[in-house]
């Protein structure tokens, strides 16, 4: 999953947070 626009919404979308890149982004957010 590319989280829609890669990072946009990663902080609110739980599915995106589960992703490899978004998960790291969520962690540092």
Swiss-Prot record:
Major location (coarse): secreted
Key word Lipoprotein present: no
Keyword Disulfide bond attributed: yes
Keywords carried by this UniProt record: Calcium channel impairing toxin, Disulfide bond, Ion channel impairing toxin, Knottin, Neurotoxin, Potassium channel impairing toxin, Secreted, Toxin, Voltage-gated calcium channel impairing toxin, Voltage-gated potassium channel impairing toxin
Expression (tissue specificity): Expressed by the venom gland.
Pfam families in the cross-refs: Toxin_12
Disulfide bridge partners, by residue number: 3-17, 10-22, 16-26
InterPro entries, A to Z: Huwentoxin-1
MF terms (GO), sorted A to Z: calcium channel regulator activity; ion channel inhibitor activity; potassium channel regulator activity; toxin activity
GO CC annotation terms, alphabetical: extracellular region
Subcellular location: Secreted
Domain notes: The presence of a 'disulfide through disulfide knot' structurally defines this protein as a knottin.
Family per record: Belongs to the neurotoxin 10 (Hwtx-1) family. 19 (HpTX2) subfamily.
Function: Inhibitor of voltage-gated potassium channels of the Kv4/KCND family. Blocks calcium channels (Cav).
Protein name: Kappa-sparatoxin-Hv1e
Organism: Heteropoda venatoria
């Amino acid at each position: 999953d590319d989280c829609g626009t890669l990072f946009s919404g990663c902080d609110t979308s739980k599915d995106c947070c589960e992703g490899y890149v978004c998960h790291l982004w969520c962690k540092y957010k």
